[in-house]
Amino acid sequence: MANAYKQAGVDIEAGYEAVSRMKKHVQTTMRKEVLGGLGGFGGMFDLSKFALEEPVLVSGTDGVGTKLMLAFMADKHDTIGIDAVAMCVNDIVVQGAEPLFFLDYIACGKAEPSKIENIVKGISEGCRQAGCALIGGETAEMPGMYSTEEYDLAGFTVGIVDKKKIVTGEKIEAGHVLIGLASSGIHSNGYSLVRKVLLEDGELSLDRIYGRLELPLGEELLKPTKIYVKPILELLKNHEVYGMAHITGGGFIENIPRMLPEGIGAEIELGSWKIQPIFSLLQEVGKLEEKEMFNIFNMGIGMVVAVKEEDAKDIVRLLEEQGETARIIGRTVQGAGVTFNGGKAL
């Protein structure tokens, strides 16, 4: 039977066209250490130029979760790749690692070349923001597994750090200052609840502007996750950092303790930073308790850094010179977990 694979739902020619379209975007991410080009069986990266005493490779992998469903609804696919990169590289930079390269995995029901190109365009933009090379990936057309409009997206990154410069959090002491770096919005966590609260139960429209939002709801919800790599690497060159936490699923309450040693807790000063209107809208429409909000969402802070008190103001200044909005949001204390405003639990 001629064209049997195509009749089974897999269009090889469309796959070839997608690869051809994405090449120009991938090329913009290249670093001098990359060996070979797109299309090889494996991506290669030369580590011989790194003058580190004890080089350690740090890896991370993640996906975008159900934020993808918002991209499907809005038929907007050129920024979701930034989210995939951000979720991976932010996780490894908190250990002091410079992201070197990234690989993506796209699984779809139908390989539409223009859609795949837009996804990879976003991935490439994320890689440029993080300074890492997109050295490979896989696009799997899987009819019957996904509908023709659906796809899943995941990524994998590898970074490098000198062993003596790994940021572990083990030297954090009571009295260290916590600096928060502003998020761009919801980032890439909690979207199952977001959809239920705002779209299913609240019946809000993606095309309308609500409350104090400055953008239509769909655009607000699809804002890409902020990538903190370059400002954090600049910070590490200039100051000692004792611990860092990427505020993802689990919010403040789950993620800040991940960087703290036993016997040390975090006390957060509510009101010390701006909480974006999208979080207020979610809490109001969903009638969500404040504790639940801080246990699910980043609440306006995407990264938390622990530093000595005497360095805090200089570090805030450096981060703001790097284009970040940074605020002192609390400090470490004797104890455990996360409390708010004078030691109260929410």
From Swiss-Prot:
GO biological process: 'de novo' IMP biosynthetic process; adenine biosynthetic process
Enzyme class: ligase
Record keyword Cytoplasm present: yes
Keywords: ATP-binding, Cytoplasm, Ligase, Nucleotide-binding, Purine biosynthesis
Cellular component GO terms held in the UniProt record: cytosol
CDD domains: PurM
GO molecular function: ATP binding; phosphoribosylamine-glycine ligase activity; phosphoribosylformylglycinamidine cyclo-ligase activity
Catalytic activity of the protein: 2-formamido-N(1)-(5-O-phospho-beta-D-ribosyl)acetamidine + ATP = 5-amino-1-(5-phospho-beta-D-ribosyl)imidazole + ADP + phosphate + H(+)
Membrane spanning residue stretches: none
Pfam families in alphabetical order: AIRS (PF00586), AIRS_C (PF02769)
EC number: 6.3.3.1
Recorded superkingdom: Bacteria
Coarse class of the protein's main subcellular location: cytoplasm
Pathway(s) it belongs to: Purine metabolism; IMP biosynthesis via de novo pathway; 5-amino-1-(5-phospho-D-ribosyl)imidazole from N(2)-formyl-N(1)-(5-phospho-D-ribosyl)glycinamide: step 2/2
Compartments reported by the entry: Cytoplasm
Family label: Belongs to the AIR synthase family.
Family matches, as HAMAP family: AIRS
Official protein name in the record: Phosphoribosylformylglycinamidine cyclo-ligase
Organism annotation: Bacillus anthracis
